[in-house]
Swiss-Prot record:
Record-linked InterPro entries: EF-hand-dom_pair, Quinoprot_gluc/sorb_DH_b-prop, WD-EF-hand_domain, WD40/YVTN_repeat-like_dom_sf, WD40_repeat_dom_sf, WD40_rpt
Organism: Drosophila mojavensis
UniProt-recorded name of the protein: WD repeat-containing protein on Y chromosome
Keyword DNA-binding appears in the UniProt entry: no
Keywords: Repeat, WD repeat
UniProt xrefs under SUPFAM superfamilies: EF-hand, Soluble quinoprotein glucose dehydrogenase, WD40 repeat-like
Length: 1217
């Protein structure tokens, strides 16, 4: 949307330019032109006589000023001109008596406090909350277990009744709901209708309870019965009366006769016998008026003949009878307003003065059934009534008019349910409806100021304008409201509802307002709606002056009002011109040439020079304002290319066809524009995908030359392009105006001298750009005082690190970004600037219009319930040194930059750097001097400084370890852990010394041992080489055999121990592929394991658990197991593993044991620490598959640990055991 601020005219130039001129001094503007505070009744009478004696009873500008001076009312030239324009509503520069009196009346109406409390939305606008009652039968009674009394003392009444700070809906503040059903069941609910507990009790028919929170007077318990009697029990709230806790008595039962006899001395009884002749329908005791109210229904009209006392008010010994036909079913007493609202079977709602019982002050009609519930909101001046058909009506308490009819309960509650109970919670402003269901209806809920500052409109704000003549702000919204605000006091002056409407099937539908502007003298308001309608308003008296329309169901996106002409454009893709000359207003409008191929999104005007329009497809056309002829055409995708202003016959035909298709199918206007262009013609417009234009702005102070950038074009890509509207000008520069992906500028404004550019983005950011030296010739550029800008804009001050907004423009010298902050949660649709007080205002899609200082301080939201800041139209806002608050909704999502700009506080960050030695010595001397002075003149405070106080316990220094329960088969949490496979480790190159001993046989260095091996010794005798007895054929007793091939039998070892075939313990060590190491507790054995006899514990391996593989070419071999017990097999730490190669068959079986330490008595086979490592390579095939085998341990010792055996089996066919 475009904001048009201009003033022009060819007649009465003195009045126009003296009023709207930007050269008026501040001294001339300080005097208020308001006449209401300076005129008296005698002066008004003398003015009336002057008007009657004037020719034709009208006076001109000079004559009217003379008349005011004759009655001692003197104004300056500037102030009087403003006053005359306000009075002259007919726009003829002549004033009569009716215009003068109308101006005075409207001024006094603006000061009426009742106009401030008119609601923007319906009293009941939120959806009701429905839930089950959890009772077996329908609810017969509903009440509130109160914590706070409804009867608030008058001295405690404040002006903050319409807003809350949160937390009021807790049970401690709002109490609990209590429901009862016919089966005697009680249920307690929270304020949010969450069940708390239930109980069983006997039902009670009619009861009322009155109390004060501070306990100033006795509490009253009022009882009404079927016979028309009323009884009152009074007791002190401090002594709790009958509710005292007595030991051993959980329930106290007594009769009324016992109470009268004084069985409970704390109770003060009082009774009114036969107060009514019928059943008591409702009772209430007012502590403020010290009066009892009791009502009854008198349905027997023949018996009472309409003279029944429907309601009786008893105060001391005085009785006031409110006689109502058919009696009273329900009533409500408002002690703040001193009124009484009654409702009965006659379908009428009556409003009474509590002290006048002769006749009601008002009778509200409109219900079609008997009234079953009434209540009053004195803060909102509203009366609510509910009839038998479950219809809720809302009435204005002062005007006695109907505001709303709410029939949603009819849809929710079944038609067979008629006995419905109602209760109004005055603290939460909620109406509770109980039957088979529980329904919660919010009635004018309070504003939560901890969440929001309030709303300006009931729908998104579309246009915000500032009127320099009346010095007020006008807001237009999508709710079809026009509201006039006084920005200096924050009050709402005028509200106009249902401004644009249309009739659909007999129902009046509101139409959204999408564009607005003022006339050149800023006396009238022009608005455009989504259905193509235009209206001219005299918004001071809410009168429509003229109705117009561009085209049916074509949205108006921009309106321009210049002298004698009105321009409107929108989805009809052309400019429509209306006459504003007296006598020719109602002629046919003029249609400009249709050169656009898509919907027009925005437009702006340069007075006396030209108009610019832009479309969704990125087309920009410059028009002559005098003739309406286009002279330049561009496309934002290729701004340097000039497009010829000529439509071919084929292009016109396609444009008409696309328009006809879009109107029939209801397609979007953006898609319709693409249908009108052939694929081969897209290249003429710059790109395949069109980029839409969101806003345009003319800089009024820049001349029309080809070197001056006078038009700013905002694109949906976040870029702002600058053009010259000269005939030989064009695209000059462009810059990025956002710092987030997907954001774009939706509205732009500037100050009076075009020094700053104010932009509002789709993400709710407000940015201010310094454009004094941007896109102008070098000779006209001026010096920029950066220290002054840093004083005005805290955003420019340095920080430790660059924020997002600064990082985006760090390589962009011009224009300079001087401020950036988040002002709204949603898109900003309109923005404007007030020059003298330096106030920036923004209207957003979040229903609010907010005021800011130029430096970014938050002033307030129009329509807020909080106190307003003191502002003046003649003083700059934000000069006083006081803390500024943040909007509650922005405070929760604000970045560090937004917090700094809005609050105006920058935290100081100091980087500590090492200082030279001399500086540190000087500082040490200064500190020593200060310490001496402190010891002489000052004493430190004694400990503890705080005296006796509670100290928080310190944090525990003990590390809290997590212990997992491993007694089960598995821990479930492990199944959720992501385990990454380990990488294959590369083998290190074999050292040369190891390669030399590969061919050596380590058995050549050992001496055969005769007899048993002593396990207590760790060394093995090594014989000399010339005494070695070697046998290649087989094994002899007492000889050690070494074999490294598959074909030689009896050369294997189990668990890394040499095989002993005889009692003499002939040792033999053999290894297959991998080495034996004590560090890993791992041994490898060949395919033919044999038995091992030793002193270690026996370990048996089952045939089904220990599997071996055979060589495919050889005969099958079965694995043998040994009953030998082996607790652990290890070597000394300094001994290296010994391995031999198996050349015949690569298939092997490996045994893996846990490295559990054993006792000294356990048998182990070890090598000497001094033995040299000997290893041989094994030519093994790569297809080896590991298989885990669980051993069976027989008779383990106490320290025996389970042994895990891993076998590596080749992928060949297994033999059966």
């Amino acid at each position: 949307m475009s904001l048009i601020y201009f003033a022009s005219g060819d007649s009465h130039a003195n009045i126009e330019y003296q009023t709207i001129s930007s050269t008026a001094t501040e001294a001339n503007q300080e005097q208020s032109e308001r006449l209401h505070d300076r005129i008296s009744k005698a002066q008004l009478q003398r003015l009336y006589e002057r008007f009657k004696s004037a020719p034709d009873q009208v006076v001109g500008c000079a004559d009217f000023r003379r008349m005011l001076e004759e009655v001692d009312i003197v104004f300056s030239d500037f102030t009087y001109t403003r006053l005359f324009l306000k009075i002259n509503q007919n726009h003829d520069f002549l004033v009569d008596w009716n215009e003068f009196v109308s101006y005075l009346i409207f001024g006094f109406q603006e000061e009426d406090p009742s106009s401030q409390k008119e609601s923007l939305i319906m009293p009941i606008s939120a959806a009701p909350v429905v839930r089950k009652t959890e009772h077996r039968s329908a609810v017969c009674c509903i009440t509130l277990l109160k914590v706070k009394s409804d009867q608030t003392p008058l001295e405690d009444m404040t002006e903050s009744a319409n807003y809350s700070f949160g937390g009021e809906d807790s049970p401690e503040n709002s109490g609990m709901w209590v429901t009862a059903s016919h089966e005697g069941q009680l249920r307690f609910w929270s304020a949010h209708m969450e069940p708390l507990r239930s109980a069983v009790s006997e039902s009670i028919y009619c009861m009322s309870y009155a109390f004060y929170n501070n306990g100033k007077t006795h509490s009253k318990l009022v009882l009404g019965d079927y016979a028309g009697n009323v009884r009152i029990l009074s007791y002190s709230p401090y002594l709790r009366g009958p509710f005292q806790a007595k030991p051993g008595a959980a329930l106290v039962e007594l009769t009324w006769a016992d109470v009268l006899r004084g069985r409970i001395p704390l109770l003060i009884p009082k009774e009114y016998i036969n107060l009514h002749n019928e059943l008591i329908s409702c009772v209430y005791y007012s502590l403020h008026m010290n009066a009892l109210f009791a009502s009854a229904e008198y349905r027997n009209t023949k018996k009472y003949r309409g003279r029944c006392p429907g309601l009786i008010m008893v105060s001391n010994d005085d009785r006031n009878n409110f006689r109502i036909p058919l009696g009273v079913s329900v009533f409500y007493v408002s002690e703040v307003k001193n009124i009484l609202v009654t409702g009965g079977p006659d379908t009428f709602v009556r409003i009474w003065d509590v002290y006048i019982s002769s006749e009601p002050s008002a009778i509200l009609t409109g219900h079609n059934g008997g009234i079953v519930a009434v209540f009053v909101q004195p803060e909102e001046n509203k009366v609510y009534s509910v009839d038998y058909h479950k219809i809720i009506k809302v009435w204005d308490l002062q005007e006695h008019t109907l505001l709303q009819t709410y029939g949603e309960l009819v849809r929710i509650i079944h038609h067979s349910e008629m006995d419905i109970k109602y209760y109004y919670h005055s603290h939460l402003r909620e109406l509770m409806v109980a039957g088979r269901k529980l329904i919660q209806v919010k009635c004018c809920p309070r504003v939560r100021v901890d969440l929001t500052d309030g709303n300006t409109h009931a729908a998104p704000v579309s246009v915000v304008l500032y009127n320099r003549l009346f010095r007020n702000i006008v807001t237009c919204g999508l709710d079809s409201y026009i509201i006039v605000w006084d920005p200096w006091t924050g009050r709402r002056k005028i509200i106009m509802k249902n401004c644009h409407t249309k009739m659909i099937y007999g129902e009046t539908i509101d139409i959204e307002i999408t564009a607005a502007c003022f006339d050149p003298l800023e006396q009238f308001l022009l608005t455009g709606a989504r259905d193509g309608s235009l209206k001219i308003w005299n918004y001071n008296n809410s009168v429509v002056v003229r109705n117009m329309s561009i085209q049916m169901d074509q949205e108006v996106t921009a309106v321009i009002w210049v002298v004698d002409r009105i321009l409107a454009m929108g989805w009809d893709r052309q400019v429509t011109e209306f006459n504003d000359v007296e006598g020719r207003e109602y002629g046919d409008p003029k249609k400009w040439a249709k050169f656009h191929t898509d919907d027009i999104t925005c437009a702006d005007v340069k007075l006396g020079e030209g108009v610019v329009t832009a479309t969704y497809s990125g087309e920009i056309i410059f028009w002559k304002l005098e003739t309406g002829q286009p002279y330049r055409r561009y496309n934002v995708m290729d701004p340097s290319q000039f497009i010829e202003l000529k439509l071919t016959a084929e292009e016109e035909k396609l444009s008409r066809r696309s328009k006809r298709i879009s109107s029939l199918l209801g397609a979007n206007r953006r898609s319709a524009s693409m249908l009108a262009i052939k694929p081969d013609e897209i290249k003429d417009y710059g790109a395949n995908i069109p980029v839409s234009v969101q806003a345009v702005l003319f800089l009024q102070k820049r001349p029309m030359t080809k070197d001056h950038g006078s038009v700013f074009i905002s694109l949906d890509t976040g870029i702002i392009q600058v053009y010259s509207h000269h005939q030989h000008g064009g695209h000059i520069k462009e810059f990025i105006a956002v710092h987030k992906v997907g954001d774009c500028v939706l509205t732009m404004a500037t100050d009076r001298k075009n020094r700053f550019l104010y932009t509002g983005t789709a993400f709710g950011y407000i940015k201010i750009w310094h454009i004094v030296n941007y896109c102008i010739p070098e000779a006209e550029k001026t010096h920029v005082c950066m220290p002054k800008l840093r004083l005005d804009f805290i955003f420019l001050r340095k920080e430790l690190f660059l924020t997002r907004a600064k990082r985006m423009v760090r390589n962009q010298p011009e224009p300079m970004l001087v401020s950036s902050y988040k002002g709204h949660l949603k898109a900003i649709n309109s923005i404007g600037f007030i020059n003298l007080p330096k106030i920036l205002f923004s209207g957003s899609h979040d229903y609010s219009c907010r005021l800011w200082t130029q430096s970014g301080r938050y002033l307030g939201t129009l329509g807020t319930v909080l106190p307003w800041s003191k502002l003046s139209p003649f003083e700059r806002a934000g000069e006083e040194n006081r803390p500024y608050r943040l909007p509650p909704d922005i405070k929760k999502v604000a970045s560090s930059t937004t917090l700094k700009v809005i609050s105006g506080v920058q935290h100081s960050f100091q980087v500590k750097r090492p200082k030279p030695t001399e500086e540190r010595e000087d500082e040490g001397e200064v500190e020593d001097t200060g310490t001496e002075m402190k010891n002489i003149f000052d004493r430190p405070l004694r400990e503890p400084i705080l005296g006796k106080h509670f100290e928080l316990p310190g944090r525990s220094a003990i590390e809290q370890r997590i212990e997992l329960d491993t007694t089960q088969l598995y821990v479930p949490i492990y199944s959720h852990l992501r385990v990454h496979p380990s990488d294959v480790m590369e083998n290190l190159p074999t050292p040369p010394i190891i390669g030399q001993v590969k061919s050596e046989n380590y058995l050549d260095h050992y001496m055969p041992v005769v007899g048993k091996v002593d396990p207590n010794t760790s060394a093995i005798n090594i014989r000399e080489p010339n005494k070695v007895i070697r046998s290649k054929a087989g094994g002899q007793v007492g000889q050690a055999r070494a074999s490294s091939t598959w074909g030689k039998p009896k050369t294997n070892s189990i668990l890394g121990m040499p095989r002993a075939e005889s009692s003499q313990g002939k040792a033999r060590a053999s290894s297959a592929k991998a080495g034996v190491s004590s560090g890993y507790g791992r041994t490898n054995f060949g395919p033919n394991p044999s038995r091992v006899r030793s002193n270690s514990p026996k370990v048996s391996f089952m045939p089904s658990q220990l599997k071996t593989c055979r060589k495919p070419e050889s005969s099958p071999r079965k694995a043998k197991t040994s009953p030998a017990r082996a607790k652990s097999v290890s070597f000394p730490a300094k001994a290296n593993p010994v391995s031999t190669s198996a050349k015949a068959n690569p298939t092997c079986t490996s045994v893996k044991t846990n490295p559990v330490p054993t006792s000294a008595k356990a048998s182990r086979v070890s090598t000497s620490a001094k033995s040299n490592p000997v290893s041989t390579s094994a030519n093994a095939k790569p297809d080896i598959m590991p298989v885990k085998i669980k051993p069976v341990v027989k008779k383990p010792s106490r320290n025996t640990a389970p042994v895990q055996i891993t076998t590596s089996i080749a992928k060949t066919k297994k033999d059966k055991p």
